[in-house]
């Protein structure tokens, strides 16, 4: 075949795609090349033909059946170097085919050598009988059994090899199919023609697995029965034990471990090879497969078990795949976090993302629009809750954009109240509502702000569309946000020294647990560090107050195999971490900042009088101000007794 190269330059690409060749034009230069050799493991080499400078001539016998690219590397002198690029999947399929071919050849060679050797040994029986002397009488007595074993191997060895080979084939097929994710099979099937192997697999996976299991069972039983029959004929009852041991080792090594290891590491390529033969076999075994399927379904019904349709990929599997994609570099860590946030948004409640009422900036509805303008200049909020009489009595939402309608009407700015301009009524949502449903309501109602109510109908905060979006993409700031507002919104954890952290009270408890590598008690009712600190103290602490708490380490795993009596104290020491909490800032209503200082000296802990074990029990030292019933001494005695027991057990090894 010949190609006109009058439009090609000295650097060009010839691409093989579905029996057609494309030639991108680069520059005008006339020359021709002729195929000298073709080897898929080496670059193709072409040479110019001075007699005809406008054609490439390919020799007969050149195989272009593979999907590949030929790229001109150089065109100097009389030779042009061409490199061939195979896709990764094609190379893997070829490697699997080569592996299978080598396995078949190796098995054939072993069988041939075995049969040839058995024939030679059996032919030399008479010579052996003459050559044996009395000194090796024991070996001569064992020779008849050995001769019988060799004879059986010669007669039935080929059948046994075929059965073991089929068993290995079925094991590879089963592992390759079950290893592929359902979504991966679907993806591969969509890229194939109608008669593609993965389309066949996707159409009825159960039929393939049933066929494989039937085939595996039949060939393994047949191989075991064949060996057992021969061993029993030679060794009698002892042959059963010998056959069991030999077949156990043979099946494990030759038909289970080795084939399945190959299939696990090359699931896609192995499946591409084995699916079609299994499909043909399933047509033959279809009646048997249907009977087995009906029987298994009947047994499940008798046991009270019902099959249920599962999604292609569960949420946990999807998160696992996202983690693998992030580790492999396919996606960024931020992309992984965003996708996981979308998956978790249905389980997130409004109370977890809302702005609490104590932090809400609202305006009195009785004020004029001039007051609202001054309010907007100060806070720069585009939407402001409007209340009447009390901050928790929110009646509507005022839009700063609506002020533009009153600018031409100067007198109305003073005579019109904010409540008259506000959009009423406000959109109210329960605090238990999921963020996913809230987002849907925002889209339906075309609003960006809602008032959050508790179960008693009291206002506890507001939530905006920005709060919902931030649950997915992370915190969003604009040019008007000050440093204080950003810290108030996100919280912060600053490491002052080794084991010393300054933490903003608005920091989420999950962020604190991750940073300090600690685990909070299950079922806790707080969302921020402020709630944790208040629970640790038992009241709202003042600036300068401190308390020592015992927390559980996040990465600690209990070793059940250890002797409980001998290692209990050592386990407690490794399991828990002690922190001293000092209030850095706060007021009568809330805590603003707190310092976490890790305590490693157990003697210092023993001298402390205010240790509180946050996991799993909660104990505290009572102060004189809280002694309402006059039992201060009795209360502290109970505390001291518990404190001594806890600290001594953690101090001793």
Swiss-Prot record:
Organism: Arabidopsis thaliana
Pfam families found in the cross-reference section: CBS, CNNM, CorC_HlyC
Subcellular location: Plastid, Chloroplast membrane
Gene: CBSDUFCH2
Superkingdom to which the source organism belongs: Eukaryota
Domain CBS intervals: 354-415, 421-479
Cellular component terms per the entry's GO annotation: chloroplast envelope; chloroplast membrane; nucleus; plastid
Name of the protein described by the UniProt record: DUF21 domain-containing protein At1g55930, chloroplastic
Transit peptide: 1-72
Membrane topology: Multi-pass membrane protein
């Amino acid at each position: 075949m010949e190609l006109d190269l009058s439009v090609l330059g000295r650097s060009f690409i010839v691409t093989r795609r579905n029996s057609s060749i494309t030639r991108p034009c680069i520059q005008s230069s006339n020359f021709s090349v002729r195929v000298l050799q073709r080897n898929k493991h080496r670059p193709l080499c072409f040479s110019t033909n001075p007699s005809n400078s406008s054609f490439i001539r390919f020799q007969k016998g050149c195989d272009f059946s593979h999907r590949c690219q030929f790229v001109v590397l150089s065109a100097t002198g009389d030779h042009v170097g061409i490199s061939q690029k195979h896709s990764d999947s094609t190379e893997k399929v070829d490697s699997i085919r080569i592996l299978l071919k080598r396995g078949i050849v190796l098995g054939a060679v072993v069988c041939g050598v075995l049969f040839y050797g058995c024939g030679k040994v059996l032919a030399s029986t008479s010579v052996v009988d003459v050559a044996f002397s009395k000194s090796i009488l024991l070996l001569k007595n064992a020779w008849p059994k050995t001769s019988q074993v060799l004879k059986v191997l010669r007669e039935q060895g080929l059948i046994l090899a075929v059965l073991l080979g089929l068993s290995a084939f079925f094991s590879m097929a089963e592992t390759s199919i079950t290893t592929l994710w359902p979504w991966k099979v679907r993806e591969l099937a969509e890229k194939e023609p109608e008669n593609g192997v993965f389309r066949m697999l996707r159409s009825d996976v159960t039929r393939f697995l049933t066929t494989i299991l039937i085939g595996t069972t039949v060939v393994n039983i047949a191989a075991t029965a064949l060996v057992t029959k021969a061993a029993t004929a030679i060794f009698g009852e002892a042959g059963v034990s010998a056959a069991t041991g030999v077949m156990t080792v043979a099946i494990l090594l030759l038909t289970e471990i080795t084939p399945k290891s190959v299939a696990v590491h090359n699931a896609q390529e192995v499946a591409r090879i084995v699916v079609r033969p299994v499909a043909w076999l399933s047509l033959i075994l279809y009646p048997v497969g249907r009977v087995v399927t009906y029987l298994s379904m009947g047994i499940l019904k008798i046991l009270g078990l019902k099959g249920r349709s599962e999604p292609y990929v569960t949420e946990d599997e999807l998160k696992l795949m996202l983690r693998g994609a992030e580790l492999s570099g396919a996606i960024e860590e931020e992309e992984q976090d965003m996708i996981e946030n979308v998956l978790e948004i249905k389980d997130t409640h409004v109370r977890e993302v809302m702005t609490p009422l104590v932090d809400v900036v609202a305006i009195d509805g009785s004020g004029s629009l001039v007051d609202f303008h001054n309010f907007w200049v100060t806070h720069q909020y585009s939407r402001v809750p409007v209340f009447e009489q009390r901050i928790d009595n929110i009646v509507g939402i005022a839009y700063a954009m609506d002020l533009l309608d009153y600018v031409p009407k100067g007198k109305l700015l003073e005579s019109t109240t904010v409540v008259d301009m506000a959009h009423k009524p406000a959109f109210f949502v329960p605090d238990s509502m999921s963020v996913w449903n809230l987002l849907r309501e925002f889209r339906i109602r075309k609003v960006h702000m809602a008032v959050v109510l508790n179960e008693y109908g009291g206002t506890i905060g507001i939530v905006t569309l920005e709060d919902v979006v931030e649950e997915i993409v992370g915190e969003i700031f604009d040019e008007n946000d000050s440093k204080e507002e950003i810290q108030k919104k996100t919280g912060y954890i600053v490491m002052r020294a080794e084991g010393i952290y300054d933490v903003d009270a608005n920091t989420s408890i999950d962020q604190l647990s991750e940073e300090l590598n600690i685990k909070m008690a299950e079922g806790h009712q707080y969302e921020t560090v402020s709630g944790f600190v208040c629970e640790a103290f038992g009241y709202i602490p003042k600036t300068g107050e401190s308390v020592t708490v015992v927390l559980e380490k996040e990465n600690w795993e209990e070793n059940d195999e250890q002797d409980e009596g001998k290692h209990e104290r050592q386990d407690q020491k490794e399991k828990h971490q002690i922190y001293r909490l000092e209030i850095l800032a706060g007021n009568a209503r809330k805590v603003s900042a707190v310092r976490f200082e890790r305590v490693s000296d157990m003697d210092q802990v023993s001298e402390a009088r205010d240790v509180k074990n946050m996991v799993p029990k909660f104990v505290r030292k009572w102060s004189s101000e809280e002694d309402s019933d006059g039992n201060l001494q009795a209360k502290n005695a109970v505390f001291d007794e518990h404190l001594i027991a806890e600290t001594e057990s953690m101090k001793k090894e």
